[in-house]
Structure formats: C-alpha cells, structure tokens
C-alpha cells in the first residue's frame, strides 16, 4: 500500500475504535491506572460489569470545562499547575504504557475542585510498539540529529526518507524534517518551557507558511512519515494548543 492508503487505513482504524465501547473501557481502565501516579489527574472509574458493546458505564465527573477555566482563570500559577498536570499525565501514558489519549482537545477535560484536571473520552487512543517508540524519540537526541549516517537510518525506518529518493530529494526532505524536529521538540528538549512565549508560536506559523509555499513539498511524493506517527503528531498538536491557550510554563 502507498503512504496515502496507509494513512487512510490508520484513520479508519481509529474511527472504528471510537465506536467500540469494549475497547474504550479497556483504555479508560488503563488510564485510571496511570492517573494513580498523578494526584492532580482524575479519570472516571469504569464499571465493566455494567458495560458491554452498546453501553459504557463510568462515574460522572463534576467540574467546569477547560475552555471556561482558560477564559476566566486570572492566576497564572493555577494555569501553570493545570498545564503541568496535563503534560505529566500525557508523557506518562506515552513513555510508560506506550498507549495514549489521541484526542487532546479542551472538550475532553474538566477542572475539578482543588485544581484537579478531569480527563474523559478514551475512545480515540493510540498504541505504539517499542521499535517505533525507540526510533521516533531518538530524534530528540543531539547525537542522532548531529550524525548524518545515524539520522538517515532513522529517517528511512520512519518513512521520512525513501530508498528511491534522489540525492536532491534526500537533502531536501532531510533539511525540512530536521528543521521541523528542532522547532517542535523545543519544549521536549528544555528543562522548562514557557508556552506563553509568542516567539515559539510565531516560529511555528512561519515554518508552516514556508512549507505551504514550497512547491517541492506538493504532491504524493511529499507525504512522508510513518502512519504510526499520525495520531502521535495529532496528540502533540492538541497538547501544545491547550498549553498555548493556558500560557503555561
């Protein structure tokens, strides 16, 4: 299958899973387990004995919407606390369980009393295997990014490069991908990061515009990257969007 078909198949699989209550139940139970490590995260308790293919039973979480919190909360420290709780929970899911909430938008979060973050709707979750995980996250390491031979090996395994690429294509896609990685991974490579920094958001928009204007990045040949990265990228975009709106540090 070509890369477009692989992407379509990946999206189809996630959409089908969103209608599978048995799968969502398992995802929710696992997320509840991860939440035990995070005092500020609340995941509803699920009831397997009261659930089936058509019914999903869980506790009701009482709180205000994350959008309401973003709109009305004036204490930046409180905004930072919620942002940090979300980052810690997501990172734990990715790095410990290698299965994560892949639908990170404000509608799936509630602010509960005492500054706790309620997380709901685990219908869209994505699992990643060890091989993909190791290759993908090696790209935030300087010793990989700065080693052209090692970098090419990883890019080939992650489908950012193809064996059939011409030398010109290889250079172009390598340069573009490294530029994206260096910018987007900036928060992951920093001890602390201020998502209220407008410069980061401006840099993202500038890079997006540059890529959009680059005619060499049009067409099927420019669609690069493993299908397994699709929902991981979607999750990071959602995460960064929430953190930007919170102006979290």
Task: Tell what function each PLM region has.
Residues 1-67, 81, 85, 96-97:
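Conserved ATP-binding subdomain of kinase catalytic cores across diverse folds
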Residues 24, 57, 105, 121, ...:
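Residue-level signature of catalytic and energy-coupling elements of molecular machines
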Residues 33, 101, 244-246:
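Juxtamembrane "helix exit" motif at the C-terminal ends of alpha-helical transmembrane segments
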Residues 52, 61-63, 68-85, 112-249:
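Helix-rich C-lobe and terminal helical cap/extension of kinase-like folds
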Residues 55, 101, 117:
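Hydrophobic "anchor" residues on beta-strands that sit immediately upstream
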Residues 88-90:
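Conserved hydrophobic core/spine positions of the Hanks-type protein kinase catalytic domain
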Residues 98, 103-105:
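Conserved catalytic-loop position in the HRD/HxD motif
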Residues 107-111:
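Hydrophobic residue at the +6 position relative to the catalytic HRD Asp in the kinase catalytic loop
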């Amino acid at each position: 299958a070509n890369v477009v078909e692989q992407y379509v198949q990946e999206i189809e699989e996630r959409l089908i899973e969103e209608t599978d209550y048995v799968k969502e139940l398992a995802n929710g139970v696992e997320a509840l387990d991860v939440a035990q490590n995070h005092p500020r995260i609340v995941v509803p308790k699920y009831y397997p004995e009261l659930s089936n293919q058509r019914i999903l039973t869980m506790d009701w979480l009482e709180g205000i919407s994350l959008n309401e919190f973003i709109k009305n909360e004036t204490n930046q420290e409180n905004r930072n606390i919620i942002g940090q709780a979300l980052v810690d929970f997501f990172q734990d899911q990715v790095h410990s369980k290698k299965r994560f909430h892949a639908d990170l938008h404000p509608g799936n979060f509630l602010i509960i009393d005492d500054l706790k973050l309620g997380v709901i709707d685990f219908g869209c979750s994505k699992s990643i295997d060890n091989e993909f995980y190791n290759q993908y996250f090696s790209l935030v390491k300087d010793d990989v990014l700065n080693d052209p031979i090692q970098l090419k090996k990883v890019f080939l395994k992650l489908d950012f490069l193809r064996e059939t690429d011409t030398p010109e294509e290889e250079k172009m896609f390598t340069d573009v991908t490294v530029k994206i990685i260096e910018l987007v991974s900036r928060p992951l490579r920093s001890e602390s990061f201020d998502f209220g920094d407008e410069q980061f958001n401006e840099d993202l928009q500038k890079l997006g515009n540059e890529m959009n204007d680059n005619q060499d990045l049009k067409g099927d040949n420019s669609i690069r990257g493993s299908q397994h990265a699709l929902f991981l990228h979607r999750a990071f975009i959602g995460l960064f969007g929430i953190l930007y709106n919170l102006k979290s540090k």
